Amino acid sequence: MAKPLTDGERRKQISVRGLAGLGDVAEVRKSFNRHLHFTLVKDRNVATRRDYYLALAHTVRDHLVGRWIRTQQRYYERDPKRIYYLSLEFYMGRTLQNTMVNLGLQNACDEAIYQLGLDLEELEEIEEDAGLGNGGLGRLAACFLDSMATLGLAAYGYGIRYEFGIFNQKIVNGWQVEEADDWLRYGNPWEKARPEYMLPVHFYGRVEHSPEGVRWLDTQVVLAMPYDTPVPGYKNDTVNTMRLWSAKAPNDFKLHDFNVGGYIEAVLDRNLAENISRVLYPNDNFFEGKELRLKQEYFVVAATLQDIIRRFKSSKFGCRDPVRTSFETFPDKVAIQLNDTHPALAIPELMRILVDVEKVDWGKAWEITKKTCAYTNHTVLPEALERWPVSMFEKLLPRHLDIIYAINQRHLDHVAALFPGDVDRLRRMSVIEEGDCKRINMAHLCVIGSHAVNGVARIHSEIVRQSVFKDFYELEPEKFQNKTNGITPRRWLLLCNPGLAETIVERIGEDFLTDLSQLKKLLPLVGDEALIRDVAQVKQENKVKFSAFLEKQYGVKVNPSSMFDVHVKRIHEYKRQLLNCLHVVTLYNRIKKDPTQAFVPRTVMIGGKAAPGYHMAKKIIKLVTSIGDIVNHDPIVGDRLKVIFLENYRVSLAEKVIPAADLSQQISTAGTEASGTGNMKFMLNGALTIGTMDGANVEMAEEAGAENLFIFGLRVEDVEALDRKGYNAHEYYNHLPELQQAVDQINSGFFSPREPDCFKDVVNMLLNHDRFKVFADYEAYVACQAQVDQLYRNPKEWTKKVIRNIACSGKFSSDRTITEYARDIWGAEPPALQTPPPSLPRD
């Protein structure tokens, strides 16, 4: 049993966490009790902490369902345009606290749970993260769902219910080891299975042409079982749906291949079909080309399009003709957003349904498809672009291959007519890439089949137009747009940093939570002594709390008055965790050289997962942990420098570390990070940014003033110029003694005395084939870090910059991003009228 709390400690739990909301404490207690006994069939003598969490989850869920049902009824009655957000990743994190925040139930639940002798925060920690994403792309989808619900859009997230999400990361002897993420082991109280909407998905087979049309025959069928998760808007009684598909084998699966006695084998082989939704592919910004992954991509698209068309056909105003559905109005009623190229098969699949099944003629079907679909590009790295072998399509999706060939032929005919004789342009713009292995370029398919293509930050959209899709931009410039990414301020401020949220509410009220641009009202208060004191105090409390967490979780003691220098994101060469490592080694060498000098104490925290097959990324983790082993145990260094690798970085850990950070590292090579969203979370939570002019950093500097960030390094133009000249890492190595010393130490085994050769391949890469030019930015980076130290010595000036950054972060709300998508791409207006709460009559 936990030791009894003092009265003072108890009262701390009754603080205004977030804002006053609805909910009656007695009712919450009653509901909790009922669920513990009737849903979980436990009494207090045998109930575990997890039972208490589940009882609370069911209690909170009860407050959702009335609003959920009411929202769907309202959509049926009003028949607004539906938005379908298709993504292979939704990185949702935990649901309990977010639901309490959005329904305004947090205070009632906190008090009720306290009265029952339990601790709300302890119960929240029991929930598993829904880790159905790798990083930024999946988390963006989750933020977008929150914003679409908060804006009252009739939106649906569609994806896959992976049985195993992103792996859990363990660090063993400094190396990453992956463990399966069995997140559904104890059940998921937030989802509702919908077997009545199960749908068939076809694979393999052959194509038959006849006078009646084209048929796809002799296919293998897998069933798609939908699981619905509610997505509540912020205090607006709207609850949208995220529908995730799970693969099920049909009951007759393989039983028609019945050889004598083959029954058991056939039943065991059901696993093969059900493997489609077994596991999330753990690659971020890297294309692997596995058949199972292509199956996943078609699986989600085929099930979702059937569902969309079913809903369109049964909608009040969707189809006027009683005999046969008219698809004329389809693009007026349906918008499909493709989150990267992963759901690109929506384009040929919609064509297949319209042409083969609904008998719409090709030209009309193509017009409908283009008007319906829009594509978001998320990366410029060539190794990330999806290029599937034609041979794989031929086997797995023969009809779709035919359709893609036909789409490509018409497209190339159009280009040839506009640019006669320009054969190279045809080659560059084709969906089919010729060569030893013919491939399908999914990005080209998306651009051709969509009415809008957007990048995710201004600089990225410019690169998309001028480089990645240059030829396509020349063909249809009006198609290309920018939609700078954003984050939901509900999860990324109110939920994770209630102290800061409360400090802001005291100054400007709470409207900023649904209109983040109102943070501008803090600008006149940048010099306000009381605000400076409060903001600094909240940050210090967050640091103390995170320090306690680190000690409990990892057994590491850190100095909470040191600068918390945080670099958390997927481990990838382009994100340049190696540049951070070189700075840490340089700081270490400076302390060792002159231990008496005044030194700003730093705790450097690096966290993130490496793709299991990405050797260099795994080496980078080993390097960070090895540097930590030496630095953290050096008595001369003492408390002045600590290096910590944050194991198993995920949404729930981000919610703890981001509010505690002083410095946010956003140091990708200019022109490689499409946008980034971690940068925005740190800005909103009162950290200052050290970064390159890349992704959304550019717009952050524009909003807050470049002098309020620590900007360093090559710009995109400089990187291009250096590429033309030829990047020579040896020049920097030979001319910068501190860089040379650091590199030599890493190379010689100074940080890996038991394996002196451990990092030779890393150094070899840095010196001889570093695509991301780490050494070229080293000098500017180290100088910029010295400016960081300089400002940190003056806490008041530091905090003024923090307040200015917070005040200027309003642009980076996903509410603003989604409002722009709705206006410029989807042609959907957020409704003027709110959904009435379940307690009121429907209209």
From Swiss-Prot:
Region (Pyridoxal 5'-phosphate): 677-678
Swiss-Prot/TrEMBL site (Involved in the association of subunits) positions: 109, 143
Modified residues (Phosphoserine): 15
Post-translational modification: Phosphorylation of Ser-15 converts phosphorylase B (unphosphorylated) to phosphorylase A.
Site (May be involved in allosteric control): 156
Residues recorded as bearing N6-(pyridoxal phosphate)lysine in the entry: 681
Protein name (Swiss-Prot/TrEMBL): Glycogen phosphorylase, brain form
